[in-house]
């Protein structure tokens, strides 16, 4: 019997597996197609990395998350495990080298974005690889019912035909019962085989705060809850504004979004992980693959557009098992904003076709041409030229991607990378280099492994710090070495891409199927409504609401969300408490009242009334001043 724990100890230093990890690993070891449902922080990567290391051959990992892909490749290499990745934005030379290494270089892991599966070069090279396991991360993306459906995932079934007999492990942190069934069907599971880790987080208290002054409420929460925190907002500009607001109020904070360059994002992430900043204010670009177990509070200043997204982001709190809070700030306008997102996310079909037509004009693409062509895409410039709105343009391009006409990648930061183009022996024989160049070469060789066989990501900032040379000197020296054909240097580049997956079509022939458009729009509306229901509910346990959404039955209330605490503290049934609370708040909105005046107006037992008053005062929903209660 394979000793999986020995592998776990050797490479990760752990003595035992957690939760259902070992059950999933043994299922894969037996050659069975396996679906693992594990919440954020459940240790998904262990479930495919350990069995892959236990057998001969290569593990093919399909994931849409480029940042996570790079992070896992780096972590595996640091453990002495050969791993590489292929994704949009790489040069053809880089892709060929990575694929050749997987055929001849005894590599254990090849990470690939789903869009690469359909390329001719990938499918040719794949036939020569000894693949022992296919891993499908974020597997909900294969389901049209999932909140992040990606048509490229449907190509995985074709890959299974090229690799008959190779088992597949599908992983996701968020899947409704409908999606669970769809994943297994679309991945052609030989038989149903699902392992579920409970999505219940017993140490995490879910809270909704209804407020029209989110900044003050945010500050109030962070002053009452100690420890590290994350504040999520949908707007890049607001990440900076909220961060500045917190710093002005003596709470150390920094901000993070996809528009920042790689170096800035990396340095801020590391500073927050080390505790140099207490709070990270971010868009949803932050958090995937982040390992910080002691986050005490995650606050959503804006409402996510699906329970899946909310559950995943909120779940970054309390991974150490200690008490933590997930707080959603909700105001009257949020409901209107959520409804508006439907038209932003699903523009009219005529508008989508118009954007396709304008894209063709933008790139001067002739009818019948374009298949396989890749272009950098500046969405702001495009929208200025053709009078479109960026949000709807982004959505239209994603729908055209799902329909198979284009491949559109959001902004992605491709860090600088290098690879030596001569052998190590030839490098040592080179003379007549400057002292600075010699110094930089020595640091490169000490800092990065595998530079003679594969491209490695480098940081000019880190090289500058270690060498004492300026960042500009590092850049110029690497360019000089590249011109001398000693190494190949690809400077960092930050840009989205558009790739024509088909020849240019006549605009009126662009077909957006019911599955691609109407069904997905309906599903999106249902998720929006589920979030509104969650935020507005005042009498149902929030943990049970989330678990029920994901198909997990739970007969007991959590006892720690704001709804449960309200009911417990009052000793009233939820309906009774809510009726008194609403009546009291309605009276106080009209005029401040003394306690005696309230007793005269609300005819309920005094002990019940006082419990409601005490709770509303403690939660700062109402306040007491000079003998009067005020809203």
Can you say where each PLM-predicted feature lies in the sequence?
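Gly/serine-rich nucleotide phosphate-binding loop at the start of the catalytic core
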Residues: 60-61
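C-terminal accessory region of SF2 helicases/translocases
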Residues: 277, 295, 299, 303-312, ...
């Amino acid at each position: 019997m394979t000793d999986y724990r020995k592998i776990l100890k050797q490479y990760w230093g752990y003595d035992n597996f957690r939760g259902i990890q070992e059950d999933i690993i043994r299922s894969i070891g037996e050659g069975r197609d396996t679906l693992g449902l594990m919440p954020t922080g459940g240790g998904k990567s262990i479930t495919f990395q350990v069995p892959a290391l236990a057998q001969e051959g290569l593990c093919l990992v399909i994931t849409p998350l480029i940042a996570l892909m790079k992070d896992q490749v780096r972590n595996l290499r640091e453990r002495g495990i050969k791993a590489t990745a292929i994704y949009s934005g790489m040069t053809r030379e880089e892709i060929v080298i990575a694929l050749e290494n997987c055929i001849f270089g005894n590599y254990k892991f090849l990470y690939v974005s789903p869009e690469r599966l359909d390329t001719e070069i990938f499918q040719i090279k794949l036939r020569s690889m000894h693949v022992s396991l296919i891993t499908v991360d974020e597997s909900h993306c294969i389901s049209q019912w999932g909140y992040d459906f990606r048509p490229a995932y449907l190509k995985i079934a074709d890959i299974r035909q090229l690799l008959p007999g190779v088992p597949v492990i599908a992983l996701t942190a968020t899947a409704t019962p409908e999606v669970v069934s769809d994943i297994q069907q679309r991945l052609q599971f030989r038989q149903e085989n699902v392992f579920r880790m409970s999505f219940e987080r017993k140490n995490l208290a879910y809270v909704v705060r209804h407020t029209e002054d989110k900044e003050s409420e945010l500050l109030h929460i962070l002053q009452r809850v100690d420890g590290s925190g994350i504040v999520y907002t949908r707007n890049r500009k607001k990440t900076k504004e909220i961060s500045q607001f917190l710093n002005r109020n003596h709470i150390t904070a920094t901000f993070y979004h996809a528009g920042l360059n790689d170096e800035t994002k990396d340095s801020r992430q590391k500073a927050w992980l080390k505790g140099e900043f207490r709070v990270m204010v971010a868009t949803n670009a932050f958090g995937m693959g982040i390992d910080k177990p002691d986050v005490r509070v995650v606050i959503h200043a804006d409402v996510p557009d699906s329970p899946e997204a909310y559950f995943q982001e909120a779940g970054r709190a309390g991974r150490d098992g200690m008490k933590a809070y997930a707080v959603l700030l909700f105001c009257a306008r949020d409901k209107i904003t959520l409804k508006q997102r439907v038209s932003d996310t699903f523009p009219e079909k005529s508008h989508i076709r118009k954007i396709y037509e304008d894209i063709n004009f933008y790139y001067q693409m002739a009818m019948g041409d374009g298949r396989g062509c890749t272009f950098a895409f500046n969405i702001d410039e495009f929208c200025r030229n053709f009078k479109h709105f960026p949000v709807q343009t982004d959505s239209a391009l994603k729908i055209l991607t799902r329909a198979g006409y284009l491949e559109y990648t959001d902004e992605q930061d491709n860090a600088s990378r290098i690879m030596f183009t001569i052998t190590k022996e030839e490098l040592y024989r080179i003379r007549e280099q400057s002292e600075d160049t010699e110094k930089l070469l020595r640091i490169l060789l000490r800092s990065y492994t595998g530079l003679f066989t594969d491209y490695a990501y480098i940081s000019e900032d880190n090289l500058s710090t270690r060498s004492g040379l300026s960042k500009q000197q590092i850049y110029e020296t690497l360019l000089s070495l590249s011109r001398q054909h000693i190494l190949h240097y690809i400077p960092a580049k930050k840009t989205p891409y558009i790739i024509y997956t088909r020849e240019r079509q006549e605009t009126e022939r662009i077909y957006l199927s019911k599955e691609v458009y109407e069904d997905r729009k309906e599903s999106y509306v249902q998720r929006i409504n589920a979030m509104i229901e969650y935020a507005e509910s005042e009498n149902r346990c929030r943990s049970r609401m989330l678990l029920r959404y994901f198909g997990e039955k739970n007969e007991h209330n959590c006892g720690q969300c704001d709804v449960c605490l309200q009911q417990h503290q009052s000793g009233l049934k939820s309906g009774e408490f809510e009726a008194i609370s609403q009546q009291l708040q309605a009276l106080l909105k009209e005029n401040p009242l003394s306690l005696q005046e309230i007793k005269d107006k609300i005819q309920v037992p005094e002990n019940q009334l006082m419990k409601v008053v005490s709770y509303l005062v403690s939660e700062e929903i109402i306040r007491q001043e000079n003998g009067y209660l005020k809203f």
